[in-house]
Amino acid sequence: MGDLDPAPYKQKLSEMYNYVKTNLPSNIEEAHEAAMQEAKENGDDNEALEQLERATLSAAIAEADAMDVSDNLNPKDFEFKTKVDTLKFVQSALDFIDQYEDASANLHGMLLSANSSDVTEALRFFVKARHFKLPCAVTGMKQALTLMWSNEQNIKEEVLKAFVDVFIAIPGSEGSDFLPGDQIAYNLLLLADNATMSELASIEEAISCLVKEGRIPAEVFSILWTATSKGTGTSRATALEVIAMAANADRSIVESKSRLKTLLDVALGEYTEEYRDWKLARAAGIALQRVERAQVDLTCAKYLVLERIIEQLCTVARGDWCVDSNEKNTLEWFSAAEQVIGAIFVVSPKPEESCADIIRGMHIQTLGSNSVEQCHPLRLARFFHVLGHIALKLLVYTESLSGAVRRANAKKTLKKQEEADKAKAQASASADDDQIEAELGMAAEVEAENERKVAEIAEREIVGRGLLSVFGPLLVRVVENDGERFNSEILMQTSTLALCKFMCVSSSFCETHLPVIFRALAKAPACDVVLRANTVIALGDLAFRFPNEVEPYTPRLYACLRDSSTTVRRHTLMVLTHLILNDMVKVKGQVCEIALCLKDDDQRIRDTSRLLFHELSKRSNNPVYNLLPDIISQLSQISIAKDDFRGIMSFLLGYIKKERQNEMLIDKLCQRFPKCSSISQKADITYCMAQLKVNERSIKCLMDNFKLYKDALFDEDVKRHFLSIITKAKKLSKPELKQSLEEWESKLNEQAELGMENKLAGEKAAEAKALASKRTSRRRQNQIETIPEMEEEEEDANEEMKDDYDGEDKENTSHRTSSISIKKSTRSSRRGVGMSNSVAT
């Protein structure tokens, strides 16, 4: 075990632990059994039993440490001590390996350093780590390969050198001597296995460069083809993926008839159908995209193989081998279908006809005579997925044809121009010159006409009048989902994405259906993160292709930065960053949303927002300066913690470097004081001013605008920030300025004291007013409470009057009424003079 691969050490550690547990010293074994029995009787849980096991092992190890070899140990005790010593050694080795693994995290960061020497040293570490078989070497090299996209050529060369040293060359040979072919193939499979999409792209770039330079032996690809044919599990697909990467630089690796036959039999044949190995089918689609388009020739064996391959590609694209009862199967098929359709557009002589056959076949299988509500959701999802991807590929195919025509015309025009130059050199007749120039002008007109026709095809034909247009209304119906008739998450995800792909083709179709997409985004369930994340990415593509159509909906795109899902917020910020830096979206107006991302809970979101502002600050006009007033205003009006606000502004104000910008920003901030509705907003403004650099002109600006902020100086926060500005200004060491600063400081302190007195007086007046208001309210409440008593007494009086009328003669009625009135008057006089007078009258 001379290397640092942890696997054999872990296996040895397990063996030693098992030996110690089964060969405990007698005294420890008895104590262990007694403790275990007691624990079981007490009903202790598994965690307690595991702790007991660990304690027993610790006691056994301590017992072995106490043994002295010089004491003539018996063979059993000697063996036990030897095993325990081995166990301790192996555990120490694993701890040592863990130390290296933990340290590798810092080296990952060094790979991103702006200092090229840091990058070089980190690469050297991962090369050595690979030679010692440390696991961190592979993960480190995967991250290092992202530097293949660096603009610095020397960095790319260092990465390629490290790649060769780690995976291709014999250790210590400096890349001159190669490992055996099967070892190189194994290393490449290890690198590509379980790699992410971004990692695979970087690996492909590195392998392509090495193949062009001839630094990967040809026998390696023969071994990989054998692994594709006879491998097991995922190794087949991984081997074919690596082959496709190499074929990007050398088509001959895939293009021969025998290789194509292997692809047909292995990746698109019975094996894939039986095991539903969509990863292998996907790899086959990628590999076939490296092959030249088939030329119809029935006598050519290669064409006949390609013809059969195209048939199988259509079978895979239709989903004929999918299982409707298995959702995972369909999810894996999606990726394979995309690459297979891409391969059809590369190798098929007439890809549009092949795609039409796929669509008609899927339409019959999916809908047939049934309504859309009766269709199996997975079948419908597969159908929509194919529709969307074919629409997108038709657009790309149309534009590629336009490019081919444009290149042919350019070549033809260049030839005519050369002829014209030659004719002029020979002083030919002017009529001939005029004729050639006329032909050149006509060529330009023809080229413009061709481009117009291509644009018209994309705008009107693909999703407007062609076969795909038939299914546009169906897509819209499912995406809108009125009445919640479709409840399959996969169906809603694929239908929304397919509609977005349709919209990428035509600007008019896009403008018409943008409201549908945004309604679907708003109605998306909180649990369906995939739908919202995919929709945001699709909207980014639409904004890049049709910025004018998407521009009115920009605020709704920014609103996704407040989504509850971290994934959605990440994707939204990445999309907006891409659009803003490419000037496809205006940042002003919603910039506050991006500024808030600087304090997001997710580290990647915080880093991305920092990167965006950093890139903006590097532009000549420094947009950050122009955005700051809006950011300050909007952040002051929303509910945000003071520390968060100040953290955001401290970061952004650090980008204001020019003196003139500092002066103008201070003036703009001063003008905002009268517009503030609370003292906290004024404190925020003064904090921002305190972070800026000051000079004589900015100090004069603050002094001249004293009346704008004097009413806020009673606040300790506001006063403290102004005093900090004065402290910074005093360091300018100009005598005449120091006198002005002292006068300004004295003025600030006086106004602060006066403001505090006014504040206290106002608070006392408010307290007195509140107390008077309480008394008035209490008096009114008492009056309201007496009304029911008055009504009750009036009812009593009415009852008495009724009794008197019933008991007396009519001739004495007048006398009795007067008597009762006198009684009422007497009662009422207790409650108020007004009521008493009324009764008396």
PLM feature spans:
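Extended alpha-solenoid helical-repeat scaffolds
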Residues: M1-D796, E800, D804
